[in-house]
Regions:
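Membrane-proximal, proline-rich intrinsically disordered regions
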Residues: 19-72, 275, 333, 342-345, ...
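Aromatic-residue-lined binding/catalytic grooves and analogous aromatic/hydrophobic interfacial grooves
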Residues: 20, 238, 243-291, 308-309, ...
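Short coil/turn linking the two alpha-helices of tandem helical-hairpin repeats
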Residues: 157-164, 228, 250-261, 492
Length: 624
């Protein structure tokens, strides 16, 4: 079999006659059952799902990575996502620091390789099916392909669109792109693109990319109407409505830059209507507290709840996908033994956000409070959660009392807040306390706020062959409720929007009220609640770039592991946008002089040294 690189290179577009032979490219991780499919076209459709479980490209230096892992890699460039453990194992550190060079760092090259690899897959199938003469099965498959292509281009154009910085301290040191990149998206490659065209394929305008996205969505809606998916990996009409809502929210947020899509009021009304249709058509309901915190199925099982509208999955037989360093369960697992690139890195919630989140909100239990690490086996009822205090009653750090052997901790004492809630752990309290230590690189111990949101499959934290085979949500119904509230703000006003925001957040905190009286106040509450809701699911990256939320991890008392992570930028953060990798620049001369530029963030770090930053661990936060 041939090896291909990316959609921009001439070698990507295989001839029509060779499509069947190339249905299972050697660069993809494939499930043996899917590979043995009796129908070649159906096998190609099935390979969409397995490709999203694990894509690789050895020639391009792309390790096996899943769709979910790509999205969380991007999210490392947002305020809520903090890493508190050993930086040497942080394979996503470039995104965390905002150091994605213009020619594509080792991590910056992933989006273009990955998404164009996905696009090539669906293009091959679309090119095989004649919409004027197709069976019901072919019609369904064509609809699935158009839905996925819309998803891929929608995410890729958001990632690659260059946005000019708005923060004065960033503008002052900006390395200007070689040419004006305003409203430039990505090269468009479809089933009709020839090899010659692919080798000289300029960046289409963002508007042109959205033309294709909306066209694909219209076809997907037409072809999938009446189709009932047998599995959540197949998009339903409800998922198409959800994609419409996402797309129109982005169009509405960029009317000042767009050349064609200028009707902001109509787009917001579309967001409201499509989000509402998605909620109704899906029949889905928000996750309950028990489902969210389920130590066996929490955020790893597409069938254990009624919230997910669209999903990816990794089967246990897909050994490359479950053993990769970019397996989602490995990356996000605090309790798992699978990889030091996960539990020793310590994906955590930003401290300021954690402290702002109400104790009455059960989502807060997704991150471990510092007091969790001070609960010894000698804990007395009613006494503070401290191993040792000094004469003044303060925590005593002098004897390194937290670096205890596993046996010194109690498995059964595990309490959060005055209600003495027990965290729902997949492993045990002693297991976590024995590993999440200063000795293992957690220099800010115990001020980590480390996550237990994402559970290994079946709750199996010590066997990657089982625990790493997890599902991942492409779309949850909760997102539609949030988008509906955002759209209501721009179409009906603050009161209507506040009511809708209250409706969804009250399912997490029954005492929540939205007291906003202005659009600005509403959006502040909206963004906070949505960031908490979708932490670790990739949604926060796309929202941050769409709404230009900046990155605000630089402050006194931050829980960042090192000062390079403690960025404080308003508006557009340049670290959201990677450059095109060198192979693509060489293969496609039309984009060579239109690459995204790179500005080193060291010129606007909040802190200038680790000593300066770490001296403030655990100190009271200063609230503006």
């Amino acid at each position: 079999m041939k090896k291909y690189h990316i959609a921009l290179a001439a070698s990507l577009m295989l001839g029509f006659s060779s499509c069947i032979d190339e249905t299972l490219p050697s660069d993809y991780v494939l499930d043996s059952q899917i590979a043995a499919s009796e129908s070649a076209v159906q096998g190609m459709v099935n390979s969409i799902y397995t490709t999203m479980a694990g894509y690789s490209n050895s020639d391009g230096g792309i390790e096996v990575i899943s769709y979910g892992s790509m999205r969380v890699q991007l999210e490392h460039g947002t305020t809520p996502m903090v890493t508190t453990g050993y930086n040497g194992y942080n394979t996503m550190g470039n995104w965390h620091y905002g150091t994605i060079p213009a020619t594509g760092s080792n991590r910056g090259i992933y989006p273009s390789y990955l998404y164009y690899g996905y696009i090539k897959n669906v293009n091959d199938i679309i090119g095989l099916i004649d919409p004027e003469n197709m069976t019901e099965s072919q019609k369904t498959n064509l609809g699935i392909c158009h839905a996925y292509r819309a998803l891929y281009y929608f995410e890729l154009v958001q990632i690659m669109e260059y946005k000019y910085p708005t923060d004065p301290k960033v503008k002052a040191v900006l390395v200007q792109p070689e040419n004006d990149l305003t409203n430039l998206g990505v090269p468009i490659v479809t089933e009709k693109t020839t090899s010659e065209e692919a080798s000289n394929n300029p960046r289409a305008t963002v508007d042109e990319v959205y033309d294709l996205i909306l066209s694909d969505l219209a076809k997907a809606e037409e072809y999938l109407t009446g189709f009932t998916p047998s599995d959540l990996i197949q998009p339903s009409v409800a998922a198409i409505y959800g994609l419409y809502a996402r797309v129109y929210s982005t169009l509405a947020s960029r009317v000042k830059t767009a050349a064609k899509y200028k009707d902001e009021a109509t787009y917001w009304q579309n967001v409201y209507n499509y989000a509402d249709k998605a909620i109704t058509a899906s029949g889905c309901t928000p996750l309950t507290e028990d489902q969210w915190h389920d130590p066996i199925n929490g955020f790893n099982n597409r069938t254990s709840q009624n919230s997910w509208m669209w999903a990816t999955t990794i089967s246990q037989s897909n050994s490359p996908a479950i053993s990769s360093g970019f397996n989602f369960a490995m990356i996000m697992g605090t309790e798992t033994t699978f990889s030091v690139y996960g539990w020793r890195v310590g994906r955590s919630l930003d401290r300021r956000m954690y402290e702002q989140l109400s104790d009455n909100d059960w989502r807060k239990k997704s991150w471990l409070h510092p007091s969790f690490f001070y609960q010894s086996k000698d804990q007395k009822e009613g006494e503070p959660y401290l191993v040792k205090t000094d004469a003044d009653g303060n925590w005593d750090f002098s004897d390194n009392v937290w670096a205890k052997a596993d046996g010194s901790w109690s498995n059964d004492f595990n309490s959060f807040n005055e209600n003495r809630y027990d965290y729902k752990l997949t492993s045990s309290a002693s297991w976590i306390r024995g590993r999440i230590t200063k000795g293992n690189g957690y220099v800010g111990w115990p001020w980590m706020y480390i996550n237990i949101k994402f559970r290994p499959a079946g709750g199996v934290y010590d066997d990657r062959n089982i625990g790493a085979a997890t599902d991942y949500p492409i779309m949850r119904v909760e997102e539609m409720h949030f988008l509906k509230a955002e759209a209501a703000l721009l179409t009906q006003g603050v009161d209507a929007a506040s009511g809708l925001l209250e409706d969804i957040v009250k399912t997490r905190n029954s005492e929540y009220t939205c007291d906003a009286t202005t659009e600005e106040e509403f959006m502040k509450q909206y963004n906070f609640q949505k960031q908490v809701e979708f932490w670790g699911e990739g949604v926060n990256y796309f929202d941050a770039k769409r709404l230009e939320l900046g990155i605000h991890r630089g402050y006194f008392g931050t829980n960042c592991e090192r000062y390079q992570q403690a960025l404080d930028v308003d508006g557009v953060h340049l670290g959201w946008t990677p450059g095109w990798n060198q192979a693509e620049l060489n293969a496609n001369q039309a984009i060579y002089h239109y690459n995204n530029s790179y500005t080193n963030p060291s010129t606007y770090y909040f802190y200038k040294s680790n000593d300066e930053m770490r001296a403030n661990y655990g100190k009271d936060l200063i609230w503006e």
